[in-house]
Amino acid sequence: MRFDFHTHTVFSDGELIPAELVRRARVLKHRAIAITDHADFSNYKELIEKTTIAKEELKKYWDDIIVIVGVELTHIPPKSIPKMAKKAKDLGAEIVVVHGETVVEPVEEKTNYYASISEDVDILAHPGFIDKETAENLKENDIFVEITSRRGHNITNGYVANIAREFGLKTLINTDTHAPEDLIDDEFAKKVGLGAGLTNKELENTLLHYPKELLKRI
C-alpha cells in the first residue's frame, strides 16, 4: 500500500494529465495520491477548481484510490504563506503543501518558518535544513515533514530524518512527481526511507501510520 502526497500535473510543470497520473499510481498500488500543483496568488483558485473536477470524475470509475485536492505554495513571499494557506483551504484544497527551503533552489529564507506557524499547512516539502524554532513550531502545529525521492531535494533527507527524530516530527515519503518515471512503489519508498536513516519502526510510521493519520484530516 502506497501513499504519495506531493505530485504535479500539466496544470503546472508536470507532464501528465490527472487521469494518467492517477492511473499510473493505481498500477503501483497506491491507496491515495495528492495532486499538488505549484500555486501562488495568481493561479490557486484555478488549480483547486480543475483538480476538484478531476477528482470528482475519477472517483466515479476508480474506487480503489483516493485522489486528494491540494496545492503546493511555491516561491511565494514567506510572510504570505499563512494567509495563502488559509485561502486555499477555504476554497476547497484538502491539503496544503509548502515548497520548503531545498538546497538546490533559491527558496527565500524564512519560508520554512512561516510555513511552520500556519495552522492550515499540512506538509513542509523538501525543507532542506530546519532550525530548532521551526522544528518546535512544526511539532506544535502538527505539520508533516517530507523525506523525498526527488533527485537534488533528497540531499538533505538524512538531516530531515534526524531533526524529525529529535523533535518528534511526523515524516512522509513523497516523490514530488513531475514525470511518469518519478512515481515509486512501496518497495522503493522503503529504500528511500532506509537510505535517509530511518529505523524500521520509523519507516513503518512514515509509510503507513502517518499517511493514514493525514488522510483522517481530509
UniProtKB/Swiss-Prot annotation:
Organism annotation: Methanocaldococcus jannaschii (strain ATCC 43067 / DSM 2661 / JAL-1 / JCM 10045 / NBRC 100440) (Methanococcus jannaschii)
Xref: PANTHER family: PHOSPHATASE YCDX-RELATED
Disulfide bonds listed in the record: none
GO molecular function, one term: 5'-3' RNA exonuclease activity
Signal sequence bounds: none
Classification via InterPro entries: PHP_dom (IPR004013), PHP_phosphatase (IPR050243), Pol/His_phosphatase_N (IPR003141), Pol/histidinol_Pase-like (IPR016195)
Protein name listed in UniProt: Uncharacterized protein MJ1295
